Regions:
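Non-catalytic C-terminal accessory modules of carbohydrate-active enzymes
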Residues: 1-170
Length: 170
């Protein structure tokens, strides 16, 4: 929980492109480098060989890890809760989410090289206090800036507002 470095390492382990960085690795892995494998062999002679690439929901789980837990964009009641948990080396992340009524152009700035800790959340330049940014309904994009830093501002999590512990944070 709150360990962006570890979350990124787990993501990299599951990301199929990491299994196919050179010709020898591609020949060993034997499945598509653009599809998440549901399993990777662990017993000889199949150690490291991918399998079951098109038959499961593995890609959806990898997507959720990357977007919802590392980048920290989680859908919530007509908007998006923004709680990044990123590697220290990520100094900036830009994401645009589009919906029929309008989108969110989100920039996460990490000048202090921290993993978590929202110090400022601005929507169209105005401070947002509750951590959930609503989607616009006017067909335009809203510009959102999230600043991370060592002086964490107290932005309540959804589960804190209903009094339950947060067990699902990266």
């Amino acid at each position: 929980m709150g360990d962006g470095e570890r979350a990124a390492r787990v993501f990299d382990l599951l990301n199929p492109i990491g299994q196919t960085l050179n010709t020898a690795a591609v020949q060993h892995y034997r499945v598509e480098p653009y599809v998440v494998a549901a399993d990777v062999g662990g017993a000889p002679p199949y150690v490291g060989r991918g399998g079951w690439t098109w038959y499961t929901g593995s890609a959806a789980w990898l997507w959720r890890l990357g977007i919802e837990r590392i980048v920290g964009l989680r859908p919530e009641a007509g908007g998006v809760r923004i709680e990044p948990c990123i590697p220290r080396s990520w100094r900036r992340v830009d994401v645009t989410i589009r919906r029929p009524g309008g989108g969110l152009a989100i920039t996460i700035e990490n000048p202090d090289g921290v993993e978590t800790g929202v110090t400022e959340l601005l929507v169209e330049g105005v401070p947002e206090g509750h951590g959930v940014v609503a989607f616009p309904a006017d067909g335009h994009d809203r510009h959102v800036v999230v600043r991370l830093g060592s002086n964490k501002r107290d932005v309540p999590r959804r589960d804190e507002t209903i009094g339950t512990p947060n067990a699902a944070t990266a």
